[in-house]
Protein backbone atom coordinates (compact mmCIF):
# COMPACT_ATOMS: atom_id res chain seq x y z
CA UNK A 1 0.00 0.00 0.00
CA UNK A 2 1.31 3.42 -0.88
CA UNK A 3 2.06 5.88 1.92
CA UNK A 4 -0.47 8.33 0.46
CA UNK A 5 -3.25 5.73 0.64
CA UNK A 6 -2.60 5.14 4.36
CA UNK A 7 -2.86 8.81 5.20
CA UNK A 8 -6.25 9.85 6.48
CA UNK A 9 -7.65 12.97 4.81
CA UNK A 10 -7.62 15.95 7.15
CA UNK A 11 -10.60 18.26 6.93
CA UNK A 12 -9.69 21.93 7.05
CA UNK A 13 -12.34 24.38 8.25
CA UNK A 14 -13.00 27.05 5.66
CA UNK A 15 -13.29 30.57 7.02
CA UNK A 16 -16.30 32.69 6.10
CA UNK A 17 -17.16 36.36 6.33
CA UNK A 18 -19.15 35.57 9.48
CA UNK A 19 -15.93 34.52 11.24
CA UNK A 20 -14.64 38.11 11.26
CA UNK A 21 -17.83 40.13 10.72
CA UNK A 22 -18.63 42.90 13.20
CA UNK A 23 -22.14 44.34 13.15
CA UNK A 24 -22.79 47.95 12.21
CA UNK A 25 -25.40 48.19 14.96
CA UNK A 26 -24.89 49.59 18.45
CA UNK A 27 -27.78 47.64 20.01
CA UNK A 28 -30.70 45.34 19.20
CA UNK A 29 -34.02 44.95 20.95
CA UNK A 30 -34.05 41.44 22.41
CA UNK A 31 -37.09 39.61 23.77
CA UNK A 32 -36.31 37.40 26.76
CA UNK A 33 -38.01 34.19 27.87
CA UNK A 34 -40.11 36.02 30.46
CA UNK A 35 -41.61 38.16 27.70
CA UNK A 36 -39.82 41.37 28.65
CA UNK A 37 -37.65 43.22 26.15
CA UNK A 38 -34.58 45.41 26.34
CA UNK A 39 -31.85 46.77 24.14
CA UNK A 40 -28.63 44.79 24.32
CA UNK A 41 -25.33 46.12 23.05
CA UNK A 42 -23.89 44.50 19.97
CA UNK A 43 -20.33 43.20 20.23
CA UNK A 44 -17.87 45.46 18.41
CA UNK A 45 -15.06 42.93 18.09
CA UNK A 46 -14.74 39.47 16.63
CA UNK A 47 -13.51 36.31 18.31
CA UNK A 48 -9.99 35.33 17.25
CA UNK A 49 -10.23 32.77 14.46
CA UNK A 50 -6.94 30.96 15.08
CA UNK A 51 -5.62 32.25 11.76
CA UNK A 52 -3.13 35.11 11.89
CA UNK A 53 -4.16 36.13 8.38
CA UNK A 54 -7.92 36.15 9.03
CA UNK A 55 -7.48 37.99 12.33
CA UNK A 56 -5.28 40.59 10.63
CA UNK A 57 -7.92 41.15 7.95
CA UNK A 58 -10.63 41.41 10.61
CA UNK A 59 -8.65 44.10 12.42
CA UNK A 60 -8.01 46.02 9.21
CA UNK A 61 -11.71 45.91 8.25
CA UNK A 62 -12.68 47.42 11.61
CA UNK A 63 -10.80 50.54 10.52
CA UNK A 64 -10.93 50.52 6.72
CA UNK A 65 -13.95 48.91 5.02
CA UNK A 66 -12.64 50.03 1.63
CA UNK A 67 -9.26 48.30 1.72
CA UNK A 68 -8.35 46.54 -1.51
CA UNK A 69 -6.62 43.17 -1.82
CA UNK A 70 -3.34 44.63 -3.11
CA UNK A 71 -3.06 47.04 -0.16
CA UNK A 72 -3.86 44.34 2.40
CA UNK A 73 -1.17 42.09 0.92
CA UNK A 74 1.31 44.97 1.10
CA UNK A 75 0.29 45.76 4.71
CA UNK A 76 1.08 42.22 5.86
CA UNK A 77 4.27 42.04 3.80
CA UNK A 78 3.10 39.51 1.20
CA UNK A 79 2.98 39.48 -2.56
CA UNK A 80 -0.50 39.75 -4.06
CA UNK A 81 -0.34 36.31 -5.67
CA UNK A 82 0.71 34.70 -2.37
CA UNK A 83 -2.18 36.43 -0.59
CA UNK A 84 -4.58 35.32 -3.30
CA UNK A 85 -3.42 31.71 -2.98
CA UNK A 86 -3.61 31.81 0.84
CA UNK A 87 -7.15 33.21 0.81
CA UNK A 88 -8.26 30.71 -1.80
CA UNK A 89 -6.99 27.95 0.47
CA UNK A 90 -8.41 29.41 3.71
CA UNK A 91 -11.82 30.51 2.39
CA UNK A 92 -12.43 28.90 -0.99
CA UNK A 93 -12.54 32.34 -2.63
CA UNK A 94 -10.12 35.05 -3.63
CA UNK A 95 -9.41 37.94 -1.29
CA UNK A 96 -11.25 40.21 -3.74
CA UNK A 97 -14.35 37.97 -3.54
CA UNK A 98 -14.08 37.76 0.25
CA UNK A 99 -13.87 41.54 0.60
CA UNK A 100 -16.92 41.96 -1.65
CA UNK A 101 -18.91 39.46 0.42
CA UNK A 102 -17.93 41.32 3.58
CA UNK A 103 -18.99 44.67 2.10
CA UNK A 104 -22.29 43.24 0.85
CA UNK A 105 -23.02 41.88 4.33
CA UNK A 106 -22.38 45.35 5.77
CA UNK A 107 -24.64 46.94 3.16
CA UNK A 108 -27.41 44.41 3.82
CA UNK A 109 -27.34 45.19 7.53
CA UNK A 110 -27.39 48.95 6.89
CA UNK A 111 -30.30 48.50 4.46
CA UNK A 112 -32.43 46.33 6.76
CA UNK A 113 -31.74 48.12 10.03
CA UNK A 114 -31.43 51.84 9.25
CA UNK A 115 -32.88 54.68 7.22
CA UNK A 116 -29.53 55.79 5.79
CA UNK A 117 -29.62 56.66 2.10
CA UNK A 118 -28.04 54.29 -0.42
CA UNK A 119 -25.13 56.60 -1.21
CA UNK A 120 -24.18 56.78 2.48
CA UNK A 121 -24.57 53.01 2.85
CA UNK A 122 -22.23 52.49 -0.12
CA UNK A 123 -19.64 54.77 1.50
CA UNK A 124 -19.91 53.14 4.94
CA UNK A 125 -19.68 49.68 3.39
CA UNK A 126 -16.40 50.48 1.64
CA UNK A 127 -17.66 50.99 -1.91
CA UNK A 128 -16.22 53.81 -3.99
CA UNK A 129 -19.66 54.79 -5.31
CA UNK A 130 -23.36 54.07 -5.10
CA UNK A 131 -23.27 52.59 -8.61
CA UNK A 132 -20.55 50.10 -7.55
CA UNK A 133 -22.77 48.93 -4.68
CA UNK A 134 -25.78 48.69 -7.00
CA UNK A 135 -23.80 46.64 -9.54
CA UNK A 136 -22.53 44.25 -6.87
CA UNK A 137 -26.05 43.88 -5.47
CA UNK A 138 -27.44 43.05 -8.90
CA UNK A 139 -24.76 40.39 -9.42
CA UNK A 140 -25.19 38.80 -6.00
CA UNK A 141 -28.90 39.21 -5.22
CA UNK A 142 -30.52 40.01 -8.56
CA UNK A 143 -32.03 43.24 -7.26
CA UNK A 144 -31.11 46.81 -6.38
CA UNK A 145 -30.27 47.90 -2.83
CA UNK A 146 -33.57 49.80 -2.73
CA UNK A 147 -35.54 46.67 -3.70
CA UNK A 148 -33.61 44.63 -1.13
CA UNK A 149 -34.45 47.16 1.58
CA UNK A 150 -38.13 47.17 0.65
CA UNK A 151 -38.29 43.36 0.82
CA UNK A 152 -36.20 42.89 3.99
CA UNK A 153 -36.49 45.87 6.34
CA UNK A 154 -39.17 45.45 9.03
CA UNK A 155 -41.70 48.29 9.28
CA UNK A 156 -40.69 48.87 12.91
CA UNK A 157 -36.92 48.78 12.26
CA UNK A 158 -36.40 52.08 14.12
CA UNK A 159 -37.77 50.50 17.31
CA UNK A 160 -35.67 47.33 16.92
CA UNK A 161 -32.18 48.66 16.29
CA UNK A 162 -29.81 51.39 17.42
CA UNK A 163 -27.01 52.58 15.19
CA UNK A 164 -24.70 55.55 15.11
Regions found by a protein language model. Name each.
Residues 89-125, 152-164:
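Terminal helix-turn-helix DNA-binding modules in bacterial transcription factors
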Residues 48-52, 78, 102:
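A generic alpha-helix signature
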Residues 29-35, 44-47, 60, 80-84, ...:
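Short amphipathic alpha-helical segments, especially helix-boundary/capping motifs
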Residues 36-37, 70-99, 124-147:
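Basic/polar phosphate-binding segments, predominantly the helix-turn-helix DNA-binding elements
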Residues 38-41, 45, 49-68, 87, ...:
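Basic, amphipathic alpha-helical hairpins
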Residues 3, 9-35, 39, 43-46, ...:
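…primarily DNA-binding HTH/wHTH and HhH modules…
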Amino acid sequence: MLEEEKMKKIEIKRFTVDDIYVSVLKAKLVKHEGGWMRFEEVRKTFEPTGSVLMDALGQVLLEDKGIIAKDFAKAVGAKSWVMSWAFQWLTGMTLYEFLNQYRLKLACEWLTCTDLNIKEIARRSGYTSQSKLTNMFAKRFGCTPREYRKANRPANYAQLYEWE
